[in-house]
Amino acid sequence: MPSQRSPTKRSPTKRSPQKGAGKGGKGSKRGGKARRRGGAAVRRRRRRRESYGIYIYKVLKQVHPDTGISSRGMSIMNSFVNDVFERVAAEASRLTKYNRRSTVSSREIQTAVRLLLPGELAKHAVSEGTKAVTKYTTSR
């Protein structure tokens, strides 16, 4: 007797691959396996996501040792630091162009910080920056 399939069970059909589906695709989260010429499978290294997270955490522990931070809070702080960095870099670059120079120096960074940050905050930022540069130059 020929085997009959029950109407509830379906055989797998060939489907076209969906966009972003599968290993190693643009949308997949996990990296796929790369093949070498010999055929041995080798895992690809995942691209590292750069973040200021560890530095934000160190500063938090210096200021408030008993306080933690959520991943959402860390993400917001990371975005904030990136934003301030971009603003200072853009302003320092503009100042360098105005003065017809080709190198951004600590003087341009300091002036950019003074222009971007208000009053007392700018003074504290400049003093901390000067302290950090002095510490770096003496350690070299």
Swiss-Prot record:
Q: Where is this motif: SPKK motif 2?
A: 11-14
**Modifications the protein undergoes after translation, according to the UniProt entry:** Monoubiquitination of Lys-135 gives a specific tag for epigenetic transcriptional activation and is also prerequisite for histone H3 'Lys-4' and 'Lys-79' methylation. Phosphorylated on SPKK motifs 2 and 3; which may regulate DNA binding. Dephosphorylated during maturation of spermatids to mature sperm and rephosphorylated at fertilization.
Per the annotation, the residue ranges of the short sequence motif SPKK motif 3 are: 16-19
Q: Care to name a GO molecular-function term for this sequence?
A: protein heterodimerization activity
Q: Which residues are glycosylated?
A: S127
SUPFAM superfamilies with a match to the protein in the record: Histone-fold
Pfam families, A to Z: Histone
Q: Where in the cell is it found?
A: Nucleus; Chromosome
Return the motif ranges for SPKK motif 1: 6-9
On whether Ribonucleoprotein is a keyword of this UniProt record, the answer is no
Give residue numbers for the modification (Phosphoserine): S11, S16
Q: Name one GO cellular component term.
A: nucleus
- Keyword Nucleus in annotation: yes
Task: Say where the protein is mainly found.
Answer: nucleus
Glycyl lysine isopeptide (Lys-Gly) (interchain with G-Cter in ubiquitin) crosslink - at what positions? K135
Q: Which CDD domains match?
A: HFD_H2B
Subunit = The nucleosome is a histone octamer containing two molecules each of H2A, H2B, H3 and H4 assembled in one H3-H4 heterotetramer and two H2A-H2B heterodimers. The octamer wraps approximately 147 bp of DNA.
Q: Write out the similarity annotation.
A: Belongs to the histone H2B family.
Domain characteristics, as noted in the entry: Contains 3 SPKK motifs which may interact with the minor groove of A/T-rich DNA sites. Phosphorylation of this motif may regulate DNA binding. This motif is reiterated in both termini of histone H1 and in the C-terminus of plant H2A, but its presence in the N-terminus seems to be unique to sea urchin histones H2B.
Role played: Core component of nucleosome. Nucleosomes wrap and compact DNA into chromatin, limiting DNA accessibility to the cellular machineries which require DNA as a template. Histones thereby play a central role in transcription regulation, DNA repair, DNA replication and chromosomal stability. DNA accessibility is regulated via a complex set of post-translational modifications of histones, also called histone code, and nucleosome remodeling.
Record protein name field: Histone H2B.1, sperm
Q: Which organism is it from?
A: Strongylocentrotus purpuratus (Purple sea urchin)
